[in-house]
Amino acid sequence: MILRIDDTDLERNTEQSLQSIFEGLEWLGLDWDEQYRQSERLALHRQMAESILAKGLAYRDFTPAGSADEAETGHSGGAWLSNPGQREISAEESDRRAVAGEPFVLRFRVPRTGEEIRFHDAVYGDQSKSTDDIEDFALLRSNGVPTYHLASCADDADLRISHVVRGQDHLTNTFKHILIFRAAGVEAPQFAHLPLLIAPDGSKLSKRKHGPVVSVTTYRDAGFLPQAFINFLCLLGWSPKDDREKMTREELVQVFSFEGINRSNAVINFTEENPFDAKALWLNAEHIRTMAAAELAEQLMPVVESAGFTITPEKMAQIIPLIQERIHLLRDVLTVGDFFFVTELPPYDSAELIPKKGDAALALRVLEKALETLATAEFTHDGLDAALRAAAENLGIKAGQMFEPIRVAVCGRKTAPPLFGTLEVLGRETCLARIERAISKLK
């Protein structure tokens, strides 16, 4: 696998942004055998440009550049195709002015013959465009730096790229690239253009406009699993032609085809309040639910430790069955199961200890009975189940009224994982200490 960084636009590329790209790819498990930066291959790009110029298939445009965009695209608006005055300068005069140091943009000399340039796109099908509708696009900017068109084609040829797979917004650029390949005497690769990922308002995703939500590392840091995020990305504009949604990396590789790609742009749904797409969260939760406990423990341990807690792998293995069905993101372990890791529970309202259809007096009776019961009960799931149900019967109350105050006392809230498993993992000493503190709050 080859990783090529298109960084010829030196003003817009920074080492920080490149590092973020590298980290994102590595997190997704996309490793590479060779790495190239286009900015380090300028000699190769210029060699192709000089070859095309020598064949008379390009010309120097000495018109003062109005802007970088104008130099890149060949026009600043309207239906500009070429500048006849520049296009028709003789080779001798062009060479003389270039040697004298006069700045120029090197442009491709698009033939004005009305020829139809055709290619088959693996996603969008047969495409064609007349050369009469293609402007004399730039190959080299006035500072000598190659444009995207030239650099991409030169590198594709040199690295023997078989398939160019890129965003749909480059579909029209392909006609220009075919002309470059033809002029260089190189066979064009196959092309496949993918639908774009767009924001809910229909705009193209942009870090400048939409912030960190467009960065892969944002999802990594939020607690997404790499395999789940790949699953989500693949389903944006592609489907396996059946009703499957949760798929492993191996399953995706096995069934993927260009034929399954939708031509419509794919929307990533996010808001300021909910920065992550609901489908992405659901898929992540599904992958978490089906992970082996040991594998999930490897993912959760760093999250817990980074929050300043110390926990053994054995203890984490006990916790996982209690929370695995309740977390959507890895970081949720700190909210769903925080009471497993803290030495002392955060403050909570003593009113939370009062069971339904009960009062503070009943809550106090329940907790005092629980303290007595748990001091001698067998501290296993089944042993705790039997002992606490017997205690409820002894008090003449429903089991739910017994369990509610205990759950709040040991977890600090009413919503928590299954009670008996939670008590077993916390252990006798911790449970008794927390119940004693709850009794003190009620008194």
What are these model-predicted stretches?
Residues L3, R60, P64-H193, I198-K207, ...:
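Active-site cores that bind ATP or allylic diphosphates and position pyrophosphate for catalysis
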Residues A297, L353-V410:
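C-terminal accessory/binding modules appended to enzymatic or scaffolding proteins
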Residues I21, I52, G56, F108, ...:
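Residue-level signal for inorganic ion chemistry
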